[in-house]
């Protein structure tokens, strides 16, 4: 596998070059602005492309090394793409509201995550011995915690890299990352402040198509990194389960012909439940499964 490919045309079609109105700009973004059209700043995509590539290389590197990557995007347009992309590449996300101290006060957040798991366990067991009112209260508490912590409950520690959509809205998250020296990849619109962003990517952070493109590229780079990391360690994820089924097939193969002789003499009713005949039918999917994995 290789890094995901993208082109100037893709960025243009996604509207990644459109900035904000000229009076809503941050002068620190001046070097990334190509010009203005109809009082709208136009982002210089010729600079965005190499910066985006650099960010994808970093993402792949962290993923290959087994690092954690946190996707952050709580604005309406980014919420769903952020969560979908993070789940697709087995990473973590915050897409509802950033709780102050999520990174800098991880111990307290861990306690909240433990409470969330406890609630999931209680409610998963149908809350035996609890009143309807109590179950309703517990459900509301769980749902509230799930919104804020659901995407990071399996993270197990602070991330090694953070990817952010809209630095203005996620300013607190970025401040916390900087305090902990966590590298930040961020999409920077013309009204953003590029200071403190380790891997800036000038681009439209409001258009849904542009956000989807950024998230897809990040997820693809992470998947590529994970595959590279597994290959380097000599582990083939696609074939990890394959040796189990052929082993069973080999063990069961000698026994498979045994029931054939008595099957002719035995009544039909007795032949049906023959326990030893069943594995022969089970052995066939093992080969099909191996072929699918190999393909």
Swiss-Prot record:
* An example Gene Ontology biological process: translation
Tagged with keyword Aminoacyl-tRNA synthetase? no
Region Disordered: what ranges?
A: 242-295
Presence of keyword Ribonucleoprotein = yes
Q: Give the matching Pfam families.
A: Ribosomal_S2
Which InterPro entries does the record associate with it?
Ribosomal_uS2 (IPR001865), Ribosomal_uS2_bac/mit/plastid (IPR005706), Ribosomal_uS2_CS (IPR018130), Ribosomal_uS2_flav_dom_sf (IPR023591)
From start to end residue, where is composition biased (Low complexity)?
Answer: 264-288
The leader peptide range reads none
Name the SUPFAM superfamilies for this protein. Answer: Ribosomal protein S2
Residue spans crossing the bilayer = none
Annotated GO CC locations: cytosolic small ribosomal subunit
What GO molecular function annotation could you give as one example from this UniProt entry?
A: structural constituent of ribosome
Query: Which Gene3D superfamilies does its entry note?
Result: Glucose-6-phosphate isomerase like protein, domain 1 (3.40.50.10490), Helix hairpin bin (1.10.287.610)
In terms of HAMAP family, this protein maps to:
Ribosomal_uS2_B
Q: Which PANTHER family match?
A: 30S RIBOSOMAL PROTEIN S2 PROKARYOTIC AND ORGANELLAR, SMALL RIBOSOMAL SUBUNIT PROTEIN US2M
Protein family? Belongs to the universal ribosomal protein uS2 family.
Its protein name is: Small ribosomal subunit protein uS2
Protein source organism: Phenylobacterium zucineum (strain HLK1)
């Amino acid at each position: 596998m290789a890094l995901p490919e993208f082109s100037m045309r893709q960025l243009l079609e996604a509207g990644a070059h459109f900035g904000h109105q000229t009076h809503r700009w941050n002068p620190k973004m001046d070097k990334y602005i190509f010009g203005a059209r109809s009082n709208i700043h136009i982002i210089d995509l010729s600079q965005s492309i190499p910066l985006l590539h650099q960010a994808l290389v970093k993402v792949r590197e962290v993923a290959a090394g087994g690092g954690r990557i946190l996707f952050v995007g709580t604005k309406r347009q980014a919420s769903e793409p952020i969560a979908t992309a993070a789940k697709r590449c087995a990473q973590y996300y915050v897409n509802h509201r950033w709780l102050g101290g999520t990174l800098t006060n991880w111990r307290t957040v861990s306690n909240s995550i433990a409470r969330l798991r406890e609630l999931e366990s209680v409610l998963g067991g149908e809350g035996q011995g609890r009143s309807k009112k109590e179950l309703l209260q517990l459900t509301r508490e769980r749902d509230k915690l799930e919104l804020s912590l659901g995407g990071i409950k399996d993270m197990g520690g602070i991330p090694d890299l953070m990817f952010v959509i809209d630095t203005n809205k996620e300013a607190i998250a970025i401040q916390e990352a900087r305090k902990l020296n966590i590298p930040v990849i961020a999409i920077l619109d013309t009204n953003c402040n590029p200071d403190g962003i380790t891997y800036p990517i000038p681009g439209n952070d409001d258009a849904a198509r542009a956000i989807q493109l950024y998230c897809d590229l990040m997820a693809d780079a992470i998947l590529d990194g994970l595959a590279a990391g597994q290959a380097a360690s000599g582990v083939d994820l696609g074939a990890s389960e394959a040796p189990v089924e052929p082993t069973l097939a080999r063990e069961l193969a000698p026994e498979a012909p045994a029931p054939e002789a008595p099957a002719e003499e035995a009544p039909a009713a007795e032949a049906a439940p023959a326990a030893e005949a069943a594995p022969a039918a089970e052995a066939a999917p093992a080969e099909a499964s191996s072929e699918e994995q190999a393909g």
